[in-house]
Amino acid sequence: MVDSVDRDRQAVVEVATQYFESWFQGDPQRMRAVLHPALSKRTASEPGASMLALEEDTADGLVAIVSRGSRTTVEPGQDVTLLDMSKDIAAVKVVSKPFIEYLHLARFGDRWLIVNALYEPG
């Protein structure tokens, strides 16, 4: 029997997986379904440099990019690790060939959505 904590863990991992699959497949509807409208996705503009610049994408920006089709030429696939989970928030690490990404998710009603993402090239 699966309890509510296990269901939540499975749901969080599924959201992270769907996010990456939608990127690899160029599926904007699937992408939008797992992103909070106020999502912020960031990366350091010049990793390791002393400059404090960040590049930032929004949910709408990511959906627009994915609308143009598949976003990678590498073999799709990802390793999703649930790092921590509380009642209504969770942290996930996703490793794929193009990216290493840390996701923060929050529960909204009966749905889990990605609200923050921090990434670097894999």
For every predicted segment, state its role.
Residues 1-29, 33, 37-38, 54-56:
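Short, low-complexity N-terminal intrinsically disordered segments enriched in polar/charged residues
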Residues 4-11, 40-100:
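Surface-exposed, charged secondary-structure patches
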Residues 27, 32, 76-78, 105:
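Preference for short coil/turn "hinge" residues that link or interrupt alpha-helices
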Residues 91-93, 100-122:
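Short beta-strand edge/turn micro-motifs at domain boundaries
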